[in-house]
Amino acid sequence: MKNIRNFSIIAHIDHGKSTLSDRIIQICGGLSDREMEAQVLDSMDLERERGITIKAQSVTLDYKASDGETYQLNFIDTPGHVDFSYEVSRSLAACEGALLVVDAGQGVEAQTLANCYTAMEMDLEVVPVLNKIDLPAADPERVAEEIEDIVGIDATEAVRCSAKTGVGVQDVLERLVRDIPPPEGDPEGPLQALIIDSWFDNYLGVVSLIRIKNGTLRKGDKVKVMSTGQTYNADRLGIFTPKQVDRTELKCGEVGWLVCAIKDIHGAPVGDTLTLARNPAEKALPGFKKVKPQVYAGLFPVSSDDYEAFRDALGKLSLNDASLFYEPESSSALGFGFRCGFLGLLHMEIIQERLEREYDLDLITTAPTVVYEVETTSREVIYVDSPSKLPAVNNIYELREPIAECHMLLPQAYLGNVITLCVEKRGVQTNMVYHGNQVALTYEIPMAEVVLDFFDRLKSTSRGYASLDYNFKRFQASDMVRVDVLINGERVDALALITHRDNSQNRGRELVEKMKDLIPRQQFDIAIQAAIGTHIIARSTVKQLRKNVLAKCYGGDISRKKKLLQKQKEGKKRMKQIGNVELPQEAFLAILHVGKDNK
């Protein structure tokens, strides 16, 4: 056991985690040169296209160190986006140390800090690594100082490397073996294995990624899931070298995968503990704290025949993604679907794309909303995650919206722009600290504003230099109203949105104008109105198409023309009474863009 090293690679987006993993795999000979490709661990097509890591991946390698010993390295490549930070915290729970990768050109950014603090809270050994030293803009001295100033760990000895060219990666491995402690645990004790991640394989059923904390797991053992008490046979187990390799046993301190022919998706939840049926452990390992979704949206299949397939797909996906929450929902405009909870907008986009790609579904998404806390006049507190569930105005005593605490790191030059943006988003400044050339800003901003487009606007006002990390702080009373959309006098539930009273006029007007452009003209007038309660705040009309009934009249009597026009008018009136308005998919997406700048 003293030769096992478990570690994660953590860093801000694009600081070179995945490339460094590639080099480590290459040096340790996990894959032959022929099988090697860039970002070997980003196995999902989506990850490759967007150039981001979404799922944490684990690899087991053997490294022959300069002291002549052979070490077993179990390492996990983690995502950098704030939406996937729960993946990072789960990966860290399986490790004794972390490589903190910092771009020697960019310096410390918000995610670097957030991930590093997560690692420190879990008492992990953090090893700083300065990456990209081959860049002309690299300034390792300055960045090392920044790490000490802002993060507070000693970086004078930080390893310098370039994952792209491979310079210094050997030193990273040597430092790892030296600084990261070996796992603790009792190989002879009762088995305790933590489920770090799981996914669904069409042939094998549920595959779980586990870290053995105590004891040993052998092939053919009967294992018991601590939370449900279910027992299963350990059919196959092994490690990733990134390829799946079968082994006969997993020893104490190792990280590997396990297949137990579990068909039920919720059979082995992530964060649970496995133990042996014949010699069970006394208590379960401390799991992970459940992540609360921050953003909710309705997802509906375009054709209602896909509903069953959609439900199965969500089940399989939620196994792989512990933070995805879903419950059935029906809408009068869109039929049956699900209300899903996500960690942020990027997460929502990714899930939607994965459903459309991997499971071949066509989906309509309604506007994302955050969770509001509502105290009704009868003093009961309810949580509302969709505008249609909001009680009537006269039944609400107080409506509270979620406030996010946002930590931003940016160069001083952009401070003015960023503060203006935060104020516009109804933010309140709580802290501001100068570190050399960088400023650390802390603002409390309503979650609804952060979720809408705050990140994009922050990047554009600071030319991409500012970075953001946010988390939920509390609920706070606020003057929020629901804006309904009426089409020919009928409410369309899927188009409602909750917004602050100050913005409601503008949002309503903007939404109505957008809808006017998107709804195709029909044989009768379509009135589009935005209303708060019974009070109409905006209106526009999609004009009818009409045939020129007078084309056949040459000269002739005025009464003849009047008769024809009158007849057409009555026809249109009848049509309007029975006519239905078909809303195109774009109309539902229009709400996503309300309140965003059209620059």
Swiss-Prot record:
Record PANTHER family: TRANSLATION FACTOR GUF1 HOMOLOG, CHLOROPLASTIC (PTHR43512:SF4), TRANSLATION FACTOR GUF1-RELATED (PTHR43512)
Enzyme Commission number, as recorded: 3.6.5.n1
Alphabetized PROSITE patterns for the sequence: G_TR_1, G_TR_2
Taxonomic lineage: Bacteria, Pseudomonadati, Pseudomonadota, Gammaproteobacteria, Enterobacterales
Organism the protein comes from: Escherichia coli O8 (strain IAI1)
Gene3D superfamilies: 3.30.70.240, Elongation factor 4, C-terminal domain, Elongation Factor G (Translational Gtpase), domain 3, P-loop containing nucleotide triphosphate hydrolases, Translation factors
Keyword Protein biosynthesis listed: yes
Pfam families cross-referenced by the UniProt entry: EFG_C (PF00679), GTP_EFTU (PF00009), GTP_EFTU_D2 (PF03144), LepA_C (PF06421)
Protein name as annotated: Elongation factor 4
Main location: membrane
Highest taxon above the source species: Bacteria
Family indicated by similarity: Belongs to the TRAFAC class translation factor GTPase superfamily. Classic translation factor GTPase family. LepA subfamily.
Record SUPFAM superfamilies: EF-G C-terminal domain-like (SSF54980), P-loop containing nucleoside triphosphate hydrolases (SSF52540)
Any one GO cellular component localisation term in the record: plasma membrane
